[in-house]
């Protein structure tokens, strides 16, 4: 779903992605992507940002319920490192619709690095004078991302981020399934 946010229906990458979907989609009047649903026995098209907002609302409600209804209004979201400005704006629109104040949209691998750095720095495990470079790898469902970060005590600097689109966990799953199918075919002629 997140790969569709902030993109146009006519985008060739979106069209390729939609081939994998089990539900019906449509182009919106503004060119965006809509999800077709049945509501009160009528087909309705909902913008993908609204669907994402529904998911964020549910997440907020679950967190509130687990925390004695303490109330969550602020959120920091991690998105793939290759997200465009339009995609990030789509995520921000979804937050707005869900009545969440998005403080930051961060790259997923940078968010991982930040978490790692805070933990290690709090335990004083970084040198005050020598730099330590750490590589963070995210094999997501649809992309493969690598970020290299330089750390010193109470210091973090992202050196580089590389993203390979179209190489993710689902591609490995497909390769394994294809291999098993071919093995089965060759042994069961």
What are these regions (language model features)?
Residues 21:
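Internal, Lys/Arg-enriched amphipathic helical interaction segments that engage polyanionic partners
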Residues 2-16, 24-28, 40-49, 54, ...:
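Oxyanion-binding/catalytic loops of NTP- or PPi-dependent enzymes
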Residues 32-38:
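Short polybasic amphipathic segments
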């Amino acid at each position: 779903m997140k790969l569709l946010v902030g993109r146009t229906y006519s985008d060739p990458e979106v069209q390729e992605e939609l081939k994998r979907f089990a539900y019906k989609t449509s182009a919106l009047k503004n060119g965006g992507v809509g999800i077709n649903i049945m509501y009160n026995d009528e087909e309705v098209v909902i913008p993908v940002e609204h669907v994402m907002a529904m998911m964020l609302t549910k997440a907020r409600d679950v967190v509130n319920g687990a925390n004695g209804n303490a109330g969550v209004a602020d959120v920091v979201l991690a998105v793939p490192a290759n997200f465009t400005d339009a995609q990030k704006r789509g995520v921000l629109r979804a937050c707005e619709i869900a009545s969440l104040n998005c403080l930051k949209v961060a790259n997923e691998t940078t968010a991982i690095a930040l978490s790692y750095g805070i933990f290690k720095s709090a335990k004083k495990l970084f040198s005050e004078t020598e730099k330590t470079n750490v590589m963070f790898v995210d094999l997501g469902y649809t992309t493969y991302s690598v970020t290299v970060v330089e750390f010193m005590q109470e210091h973090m600097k992202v050196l580089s981020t590389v993203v390979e689109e179209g190489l993710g966990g689902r591609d490995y799953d497909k390769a394994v399934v294809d291999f098993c199918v071919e093995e089965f075919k060759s042994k069961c002629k």
